[in-house]
Design a protein with these regions (language model features):
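Conserved beta-strand-loop-short alpha-helix elements that form
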Residues: 2, 116-126
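Fold-independent oxyanion-binding glycine-rich loops
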Residues: 10, 93-96, 121, 196, ...
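Short acidic (Asp/Glu) patches
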Residues: 31-33, 68-84, 88, 92-114, ...
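Catalytic core of PPM/PP2C metal-dependent serine/threonine phosphatase domains
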Residues: 89, 166-203
Length: 259
């Protein structure tokens, strides 16, 4: 299992979202409140991806990623980077590796390509045999160049394949969740995706909360604090969030409910 978050809004330091909140990802790495399906800590690596600030009118820069196989609380270099780095969008995660899967930096989220950043909180049941069918839709080169031999890396490859084909981001996540659930029933499939302007996420087997106001959107496995405005996402729902807009839709439906 893992914990993850994504933010889009006014530029803030990474530290203010990841390290400093009373229940930020740093605390969730060693004292999570709502781990489901096994695991007690998230100490098998972590990562963060952020979108560098660019001058007004300039095209947006692709995100920068920092990934490690160490627990977040042991990495003084990341703490320094997070305190000195300001971004208007980011995705970060802490990892609890499924038994038998490698603990390496390349196995830690976020995964990415171009403008996209992606994370998975959960597990694919019966890995790897159960998902041979969905994996067969990928080009062989995609399978040979997975970031790591893990379920999360394969899920990213499946989502990325749909995005490359022109799928709308929410539809790409929905299609992958439903295909993998059919092939591997009982999987836990909380997926998180951003392009730096909006956030898409699924709640499928694990907790997920959102906080959206006119200025910012924040999606997190667990609320970062006890402040007002947090909303728990119902099980088996798709989230589309951007500043000033939150949409929820059942993952078996294509009709969103705008909040």
């Amino acid at each position: 299992m893992c914990r993850h978050l994504a933010y889009v809004g006014p530029p803030v330091t990474m530290s203010s979202l990841v390290l400093e909140p009373p229940h930020g990802l740093l605390r969730q790495s060693y004292a999570p409140r709502d781990m489901r399906g096994g695991g007690t800590v998230n100490a098998d690596g972590f990562g963060a991806g952020w979108y560098p600030a660019v001058p007004v009118g300039s095209p947006g820069a692709d995100p920068v990623r920092y990934r490690s196989a160490s627990p977040m609380w042991t990495d003084a270099a990341f703490a320094a980077v997070a305190g000195a780095t300001t971004a208007g969008a980011l995705l970060a995660a802490v990892r609890s590796a499924t038994v038998g899967m490698p603990v390496t930096a390349s196995a830690s989220a976020p995964f990415g390509e171009g403008r996209w950043l992606f994370s998975h909180n959960g597990v694919v049941r019966g890995w790897p045999a159960a998902v041979a069918g969905p994996a067969a839709e990928l080009p062989v080169t995609d399978l040979l160049t997975l970031d790591a031999p893990t379920d999360s890396a394969l899920l990213w490859a499946l989502v990325r394949h749909r995005l490359r084909a022109g799928a709308e981001p929410g539809a790409a996540l929905t299609g992958v969740v439903l295909a993998v659930e059919q092939a591997a029933p009982g999987s836990r499939l909380n997926l998180l995706l951003t392009d730096g302007a909006a956030i898409w996420a699924t709640a499928w087997g694990h907790a997920l909360s959102v906080r959206v106001d006119a200025a910012a959107a924040l999606v997190s496995s667990e609320p970062l604090d006890d402040g007002i405005g947090w909303e728990e996402v119902p099980h088996r729902h798709l989230v589309t969030a951007r500043p000033g807009q939150l949409r929820l839709a059942p993952l078996t439906s294509t009709t969103p409910q705008t909040r």
